[in-house]
Amino acid sequence: MDEKSKLIDRYYDRYFESYFRRFINSFFRFNALPVVYTLGIKYLCNQKLRYMIIETKHLIIRYFQEKDVAGLLEYLSHPRVNCFVGDRLCSVESALAYISNTPKDMLRYAVCLKEDDFIIGDVFALREYTDTFSVGWHFNQRFEGKGLAYEAATEFLDYLFCDAGARRVYGFVEDDNLRSKRLCKRLGMRYERCMKEFISFVCYPDGTPRYEDTCIYAILNKEWTEQREQKPNSLGLCRVVTDMHEMNEKKQ
């Protein structure tokens, strides 16, 4: 292929990419995700969401990078609650796999300090239906007591409702996980019920399963909107949402 043909191909590739991104953005802007799913481009929508970046007063919530491995190992080498035993990372290789092998229906982001981009946790959401997400989070114990988990979770929920088309967001919380229960309440999530001995993640010393009492906390889009209108920008957040393509274009 000669140089002229290569330039023409490159032009059409960039034109198509730009056009397609505007096409997808229009669905997000008008909250038409059910139509998007019907058209069969759910995976492409999740790919767009996956590369979003949220900037708050103290944090950057972004897609994972290889430099996050050390920070990931710091808080996931010894998960503090039983439900995340399966996420335990024991090596650099397992941390790299955690970063690169995010399920297609899951959104998972690194929560990093704005001052030095060091990862202190992550937030994630699994799309279970077109407009329903199950959420969760990990945070480094070393950074507790500063309101950072609340800041990250607040903006993540706002992102799910405003940008990802969520109608309902809920989370499973073990009954003895007091930190997450307090966080859910502070976020305005409604306690719905507690399922006794719902699931087992670990065993007792004698090998018998230890079943956990599991609570459900949830909130609807309309409840979140009403709550945010009553206390607009209560954290003093400077929320900026962008995506990887826009960042690269700005750098160029």
Give a label for each model feature.
Residues M1, I8, I24, V35-V36, ...:
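Short hydrophobic transmembrane-like helices used for membrane targeting/insertion
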Residues R10, R14, R21-R22, R29, ...:
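Basic polycationic patches enriched in arginine
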Residues R80-N101:
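Conserved GNAT-fold acetyl-CoA-binding loop/helix
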Residues F84-L89, L107-L113:
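A short, aromatic/hydrophobic, helix- or strand-capping loop or linear motif
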Residues I99-A110, G121:
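A short helix-loop-beta-strand connector motif used in the catalytic cores of GNAT acetyltransferases and
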